[in-house]
C-alpha cells in the first residue's frame, strides 16, 4: 500500500481524537466555564452540526480544486478550530470553535477516500479506504484515552492544543506524501458532483448508512449505564472497556476492507446481519462481566465491518461525483449518531430497561439491512433493463416473409 495512506490516517487520527474526546472532558469543561453539564453537552452537538453542514458544503465548494490542496486546506481549518477551542474565553466562543472544528471532518474523509482509492489497483480500493479509517479507530484505542487523561491532569485546554499539534503533523505528512494532482481539478466539477446526488441508488446507500450506524449509536450512546447497571462494572472500568470497543472497531474496519475487495455486497449484508445479531444478544450478554466485555468488542467489529463497503458503495453509485457523495456519506454518519442516540433514549424513557437501546438498535440495523436489500433489487432491475436494451440493439432484423 502507498505510504501516502499514512498521511490520511494521521489526519483521521486527529479528527477521531477531537470528535470523541469532548465526551470525556465535559465535567472539566463545565466546571471551568461555570455551566451545567447539559449545557456543556451542546459542545458535542456543535461539532456534529459542523460535520453535517461542512461535509457537503466544503466538498461542493472545493470541487474544482486540486484534491491534495483541498486536504491540506481542510487540515489547516481543523488546526484553527482546535487552537481556537483551546483559547476560547467562554462557552459561546467554545461552541463556535467546536462548530468550526467539525466543518472539515466530513469533507476530509470524503475527499480522502477518493484520493486513497485513486492510488491503488481496483482490487485494493476498499482496503485503501479501511487504512485511512484506521486512524479513526486507533484514535478510540489510544488517542481519546490519552487526550482525556491529558485534559484531566493539565486542563482541558491542553487537550485541544495537543490535537492542534497532531493536525500540524498531518499537514506536513499530506504535503510530503500525497502526490500532486496533475489536473487542476476533477473533470466533473461542481455540476457533475451535484448531478451524482440525484441518483436513487446513492440515496439508498446513504439511507443504509443512517440506519446501520444509527443502530450502533443507539447502543453505544448508552453503553456506560449498560456496563455499570447491567453487567456490574465499576465506573472506573468503563474507559478500559471503551478502548476494547476501539480494538473491535479496528478489527472490523480492517476485516471489512479486505472482504469488500473480494465481495463488497455480501460483506455489507453480512456486516449488517451480524450487527442485528449482536445487538439482539445484548440483553443476554450484559448479565455478566465477561459477557459485557464480549458485547462491547463484538459491537465494534460488527459495526465497522460495514464502514468500507458503505463508503465504496456510495462512491461507485456516484462515480461522476465521488467527492461530494463520499462527503455526504460522512454527514450521514453524523445524522446516524444523533438519530441513533435519540432512538435509544426513547427506548430508555419508555421504561423498557437499561439494555433497551441495544434492542432498538437491532431494529435499526434490520431496517438498514432492508434498505440495502431494496438497493440490491433496484440495481438488479436496472441491470436487467440495460441488458435488455443491449440485446435488442444487437438483434438482427428478420427478413420479411414472402406471401404467395
Short names for language-model regions:
Residues 317-354, 361:
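A late C-terminal transmembrane helix in Major Facilitator Superfamily
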Residues 164-184, 371-375:
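C-terminal membrane-cytosol helix-exit motif in multi-pass small-molecule transporters
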Residues 6, 77-84, 92-101, 290-298:
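Paired small-residue
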Residues 55-67, 252-264, 348-349:
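Helix-to-loop junctions at the C-terminal end of transmembrane segments
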Residues 97-136:
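Cytoplasmic helix-loop-helix junction between adjacent transmembrane helices
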Residues 53-92:
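Conserved MFS/SLC helix-loop-helix module at the cytosolic interface between two early adjacent transmembrane helices
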Residues 266-310:
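C-terminal transmembrane helical hairpin of 12-TM major facilitator-type secondary transporters
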Residues 34, 66, 87-93, 232, ...:
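Helix-breaking motifs and short loop linkers at transmembrane-helix boundaries and internal kinks
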Amino acid at each position: 500500500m502507498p505510504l501516502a495512506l499514512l498521511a490520511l490516517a494521521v489526519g483521521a487520527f486527529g479528527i477521531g481524537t477531537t470528535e470523541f474526546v469532548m465526551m470525556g472532558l465535559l465535567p472539566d469543561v463545565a466546571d471551568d466555564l461555570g455551566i451545567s453539564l447539559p449545557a456543556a453537552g451542546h459542545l458535542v452537538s456543535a461539532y456534529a452540526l459542523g460535520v453535517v453542514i461542512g461535509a457537503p458544503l466544503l466538498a461542493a465548494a472545493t470541487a474544482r480544486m486540486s484534491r491534495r490542496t483541498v486536504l491540506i486546506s481542510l487540515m489547516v481549518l481543523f488546526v484553527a478550530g482546535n487552537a481556537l477551542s483551546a483559547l476560547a474565553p467562554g462557552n459561546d466562543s467554545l461552541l463556535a470553535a467546536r462548530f468550526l472544528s467539525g466543518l472539515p471532518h466530513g469533507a476530509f474523509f470524503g475527499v480522502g477516500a477518493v484520493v486513497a482509492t485513486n492510488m491503488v489497483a481496483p482490487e485494493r480500493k476498499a482496503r485503501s479506504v479501511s487504512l485511512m479509517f484506521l486512524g479513526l479507530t486507533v484514535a478510540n484505542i489510544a488517542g481519546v484515552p490519552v487526550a482525556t487523561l491529558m485534559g484531566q491532569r493539565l486542563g482541558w485546554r491542553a487537550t485541544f492544543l495537543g490535537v492542534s499539534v497532531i493536525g500540524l503533523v498531518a499537514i506536513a505528512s499530506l504535503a510530503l506524501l500525497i502526490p500532486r494532482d496533475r489536473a487542476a481539478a476533477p473533470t466533473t466539477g461542481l455540476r457533475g458532483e451535484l448531478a451524482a446526488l440525484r441518483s436513487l441508488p446513492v440515496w439508498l446507500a446513504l439511507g443504509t448508512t443512517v440506519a446501520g450506524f444509527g443502530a450502533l449509536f443507539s447502543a453505544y450512546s448508552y453503553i456506560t449505564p449498560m456496563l455499570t447497571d447491567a453487567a456490574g462494572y465499576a465506573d472506573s472500568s468503563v474507559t478500559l472497556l471503551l478502548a476494547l470497543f476501539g480494538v473491535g472497531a479496528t478489527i472490523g474496519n480492517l476485516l471489512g476492507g479486505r472482504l469488500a475487495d473480494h465481495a463488497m455486497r455480501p460483506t455489507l449484508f453480512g456486516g449488517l446481519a451480524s450487527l442485528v445479531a449482536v445487538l439482539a444478544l445484548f440483553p443476554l450478554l450484559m448479565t455478566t462481566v465477561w459477557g459485557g466485555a464480549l458485547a462491547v468488542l463484538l459491537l465494534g467489529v460488527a459495526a465497522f465491518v460495514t464502514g468500507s463497503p458503505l463508503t465504496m458503495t456510495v462512491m461507485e453509485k456516484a462515480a461522476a461525483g465521488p467527492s461530494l457523495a463520499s462527503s455526504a456519506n460522512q454527514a450521514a454518519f453524523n445524522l446516524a449518531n444523533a438519530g441513533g442516540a435519540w432512538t435509544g433514549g426513547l427506548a430508555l424513557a419508555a421504561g423498557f430497561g437499561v439494555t433497551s437501546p441495544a434492542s432498538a438498535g437491532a431494529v435499526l440495523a434490520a431496517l438498514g439491512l432492508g434498505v440495502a436489500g431494496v438497493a440490491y433489487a433496484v440495481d438488479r432491475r436496472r441491470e436487467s433493463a440495460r441488458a435488455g436494451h443491449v440485446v435488442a440493439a444487437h438483434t438482427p432484423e428478420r427478413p420479411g416473409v414472402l406471401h404467395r
